Design a protein with these regions (language model features):
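Expand to "…catalyze enediolate/carbanion chemistry for C-C bond making/breaking, isomerization
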Residues: 1-208
């Protein structure tokens, strides 16, 4: 059953573009995801962390997407973010409880996690991912998933994957999952069509 009070729209903003933070928070999106991962180049990772630590943010509406736990930037993210009142962390390429437990431990078991399902391994690990008490809900990352699977990125190619994410979330008693981003975000008709498709499948929110 849908939670009418749950966030529906999630807006990405690169961590190294602090001039966009306030605009994103004023955009009307329910949540703003400040991204330290794919949206920030390797040479700008430190600048991105510095921008987040120095920003005046409404942490009740901000989610931080950290770098993959296997990357060299993960520990630097933890070091920078641990002293901030971050409430929710998005975990890319989450592939099981070991990965998530590492994040939970690094942040002293005091944050809510949103794991991203971005490869086949993470799809088949959904039962253990969703059973973790610190997991709020999961989010789909269709571009990385299609790359891992070797499939197309269109609705038809990944409908079966989306359905599995929705079904497993319902079975685990978790809130409806968050669907992936619309690549051409400047096309409002495409974004609306994507959102309608996501809703039809049972997703409760979408990344913009």
């Amino acid at each position: 059953m849908a939670n009418l009070d749950a966030p529906i729209t999630y807006l990405f903003v690169p961590a190294d573009r602090p001039e966009r933070f306030a605009k994103a928070l004023a955009s009307g999106a329910d949540r703003v995801i400040i991204d330290l991962e794919d949206a920030v180049t390797a040479k700008n990772k430190t600048a991105g962390r510095d921008a987040v630590t120095s920003a005046d943010l409404d942490w009740s509406r901000v989610i931080i997407r950290i770098n993959d736990v296997t990357s060299s930037d993960f520990e630097s993210d933890v070091s920078a973010l641990r002293r901030l009142p971050v409430q929710t962390i998005m975990v890319p390429k989450a592939d099981g409880q070991t990965c998530l437990q590492r994040v939970d431990d690094a942040f002293d078991n005091a944050r809510t996690l949103i794991p991203q399902i971005e490869n086949v391994k993470s799809l088949f690990a959904l039962p253990e991912i969703l059973s973790a008490p610190y997991v709020d809900r999961v989010a789909f990352g269709h571009l990385d998933f299609a790359l891992d699977l070797g499939s197309g990125t269109d609705h038809e190619a990944l409908a079966h994957v989306r359905s599995q994410i929705v079904l497993q979330s319902r079975l685990a008693g978790k809130p409806q999952p968050i669907d992936s981003v619309t690549v051409d975000f400047r096309d409002p008709e495409l974004a609306e069509a994507d959102a309608r498709f996501s809703r039809k499948l049972g997703f409760g929110g979408k990344i913009l």
